[in-house]
Amino acid sequence: MTMSDPIADMLTRVRNANMVRHEKIELPASNIKKQIAEILKSEGFIKNVEFVEDDKQGVLRLFLKYGQNNERVITGLKRISKPGLRVYAKADEVPKVLNGLGIALVSTSEGIVTDREARKRNVGGEVLAYVW
C-alpha cells in the first residue's frame, strides 16, 4: 500500500519513539526525509543520521537525543502543510515557532531550510512542519 504523506509518517515515527524514549528509529529513506533529518541533526534535535543501503530505496536510521535526566529534546512536532491543504508563506511571512525557540521546516526553491535560513536568504515556500 502506498503512503499518502511520507513526511507526516516520519514525524509520527519520531514523535512516538521520542515519547517512549527509544534510542533509534528506522524509516524508509527518501531525499526529502534525508534533508529533514540533516536539519534536525544540525539544529541539535537528534544525535545522528545514518543511511543504510538495502535492495530497495534504503533505510534512514535516526538516533534520538535526550537530556541529562532523560528528558526529551524534541518536545513537539507538528505537520503544517498537508496533501489536502497546502500552506505556503512568502519570504516576509515565514512563521517563527515559539518566538524562535523552535524551527519551521520550509521547502523552498533552494531545498528544505529552517525558518531562520529562509528569512536570511529572503525566500518563501511551503511550510512543511514545526519542531520545538
Curated annotation (Swiss-Prot):
A cellular component annotation (GO) from this entry: ribonucleoprotein complex
One Pfam family in the UniProt entry: Ribosomal_S8
InterPro entries xrefs: Ribosomal_uS8 (IPR000630), Ribosomal_uS8_CS (IPR047863), Ribosomal_uS8_sf (IPR035987)
Biological process per Gene Ontology, one example term: translation
Coiled coil: none
Swiss-Prot/TrEMBL keywords: Ribonucleoprotein, Ribosomal protein, RNA-binding, rRNA-binding
GO molecular function, one term: rRNA binding
UniProt record similarity statement: Belongs to the universal ribosomal protein uS8 family.
Function as written in the Swiss-Prot or TrEMBL entry: One of the primary rRNA binding proteins, it binds directly to 16S rRNA central domain where it helps coordinate assembly of the platform of the 30S subunit.
Subunit structure and binding partners: Part of the 30S ribosomal subunit. Contacts proteins S5 and S12.
HAMAP family xrefs: Ribosomal_uS8_B
Protein name: Small ribosomal subunit protein uS8
Organism name: Staphylococcus carnosus (strain TM300)
The organism's taxonomic lineage, starting at the top: Bacteria, Bacillati, Bacillota, Bacilli, Bacillales
Gene from which the chain derives: rpsH
